[in-house]
């Protein structure tokens, strides 16, 4: 599935563009997704993930090993 963060599950949201005259038209708010490679020392390989910026902060805080363990517990293929 496109435009979904594998760690946080963030997806596009729907909202309105609001003009100065208060006219409203539908728009999508897209998550800030980035492709990042992480070296996993225990597996001796690179892992490429599509992450939101919030997920990058989570990995900085908890470490890639912990995040990958959570993904595998949820049944994600990494």
Swiss-Prot record:
One of its GO terms (molecular function) is structural constituent of ribosome. One of its GO terms (cellular component) is cytosolic large ribosomal subunit. The keyword Repressor does not apply. GO terms for biological process: translation. Keywords: Ribonucleoprotein, Ribosomal protein. Gene3D superfamilies: Ribosomal protein L28/L24. Belongs to the bacterial ribosomal protein bL28 family. This is Large ribosomal subunit protein bL28. It comes from Thiobacillus denitrificans (strain ATCC 25259 / T1).
